[in-house]
Swiss-Prot record:
The keyword Membrane applies. It is a multi-pass membrane protein. GO terms for molecular function: phosphatidylglycerol-prolipoprotein diacylglyceryl transferase activity. The lineage of its organism: Bacteria, Pseudomonadati, Pseudomonadota, Betaproteobacteria, Nitrosomonadales. Keywords: Cell inner membrane, Cell membrane, Membrane, Transferase, Transmembrane, Transmembrane helix. It is found in: Cell inner membrane. The gene is lgt. It comes from Nitrosomonas europaea (strain ATCC 19718 / CIP 103999 / KCTC 2705 / NBRC 14298). Catalyzes the transfer of the diacylglyceryl group from phosphatidylglycerol to the sulfhydryl group of the N-terminal cysteine of a prolipoprotein, the first step in the formation of mature lipoproteins. Belongs to the Lgt family. This is Phosphatidylglycerol--prolipoprotein diacylglyceryl transferase.
């Protein structure tokens, strides 16, 4: 049996300014997004993405993650609490972000980016999908440091007692999600996108992969409260939200290979001088 280290949630404190580990994990995720994105641009000199677009994608994506992730948590998991404490919605530094809400927020943000640059929405999402998983993994490390989103009671040797739960050893499900939704998903999507794929295929594969890994990890994670209750039909809130994601990913993957859409056909060509700015 293990005991959670009970980290200080504040990583850096300078006078009244306190920087939390949870926020640093988000910063790490955004930094990895830029570094990996620049690498992909160098590897695809004739692609539709430029460094200027990548910087814009980060800006749009940050807004989508924060707004969508927070609103998703409020609506999907704790609507009753936030109706009684509406100002707490703004306290994002205390944690409480929903991946599925953030996913919808980023999808809308990338639609705005695609319209700005007159590109296919799927051409944009295909490019950024491989850049996302490591950031998701960093977020799960932030959850572990905070001692939140712990797993179900277990008798496995690595069961861990968390400070804000009862004294029962539990699965460190945050670390399971870090491994699967972060490292494994990154490796799969990065390798899959290394070769030319039909338009929308990389996005569809990401949706299937994340939804499947999240659904699997939910069997070890303590179910969250939500507007559907803790468990409905034996399915947790995270699984309910992942099932349509998997279904949409399968449909998108089928469409991509059925019609063999090509990014160069769906995306309007950028001027040569814009392409060569990298």
């Amino acid at each position: 049996m293990l005991v959670h280290p009970q980290f200080d949630p504040v990583a850096i404190s300078i006078g009244p300014l306190a920087v939390r580990w949870y926020g640093l994990m988000y910063l790490l995720g955004f930094s990895l997004f830029i570094l990996l994105g620049r690498y992909r641009i160098r590897q695809q000199p004739n692609g539709v993405f430029t460094r200027e677009m990548l910087d814009d994608a980060l800006f749009y994506g940050v807004l989508g993650v924060i707004l969508g992730g927070r609103l998703g948590h409020v609506l999907f998991y704790e609507p009753g609490y936030y109706l009684q404490h509406p100002l707490e919605i703004l306290a994002i530094w205390q944690g409480g972000m929903s991946f599925h809400g953030g996913f919808l927020g980023v999808a809308i943000a990338m639609l705005c980016l695609a319209r700005k640059y007159q590109l296919s929405w799927l051409a944009v999402t295909d490019f950024i999908a491989p850049l996302v998983p490591l950031g998701l993994g960093a977020g799960r490390i932030g959850n572990f440091i905070n001692g939140e989103l712990w797993g179900r009671p277990t008798d496995v040797p690595w069961g861990m007692i968390f400070p804000y739960a009862d004294n029962l050893p539990r699965h460190p499900s945050q670390l399971y999600e870090f491994a699967l939704e972060g490292l494994v998903l990154f490796a799969l999507i990065w390798l899959y996108s290394a070769k030319p794929r039909p338009l929308g295929a990389v996005t569809g594969m990401f949706m299937i992969g994340y939804g499947a890994f999240r659904s699997f990890c939910e069997f070890f994670r303590e179910p969250d409260d939500g507007f559907l209750g803790i468990m409905t039909l034996g399915i947790s809130m995270g699984q309910w939200l992942s099932l349509p994601m998997i279904a949409a990913g399968i449909a998108l993957l089928y469409w991509a290979y059925r019609y063999d859409g090509k990014p160069e056909k769906a995306a309007r060509k950028l001027p040569r001088e814009r392409k060569n700015r990298d």
